[in-house]
Amino acid sequence: MSRQQQDRGEVSAQVVLVTPVIILLLVIAIQAGLYFHTSSIAGAAAAEGAAAASVVRASREVTAWRGQQAAQNLVIEAGGRTTSAAVVAVNTATVAITVVVRVPRIIPFFPSSVRRTVIEPRERFTTELAR
């Protein structure tokens, strides 16, 4: 028997063994991309909400509402889905906003949501003499 006849069918066996591994790696790469994209959306939404809430000179409820609305609008515009309303903590010096965005899942062992928190100082208006 010649060498070519002995090696027949070896390539198809290799393809059958390697193809699932390549597909699994491709799916993991896609899931990782979705996770990092969602993480970017959550961070941007938290920053936008904190920035919107930090410039409001109103009651804490109005400040929190403005921050929530700004964060929610950015998540919707970017195509993400929040798991709950943004949580805004307002005190006299800072505004902290936490946004949780759901990650689209292809495979089960990746996290199902991303949480990002941004703390921003509140704007303070001072007189010229107080500077």
Task: Set out the residue ranges of the language-model regions.
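Short amphipathic secondary-structure patches
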Residues: 48-102, 129
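Extracytoplasmic/periplasmic mature domains of Sec-exported, cell-envelope-associated bacterial proteins
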Residues: 29, 59-60, 81, 104, ...
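Residues in flexible loops and secondary-structure boundaries
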Residues: 25, 44, 61, 95, ...
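Low-complexity, S/T/G/P-rich flexible repeat/linker segments used as non-globular hinges
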Residues: 105-131
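Alpha-helical assembly-interface signal, strongest on the long, hydrophobic N-terminal helix that forms
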Residues: 1-68
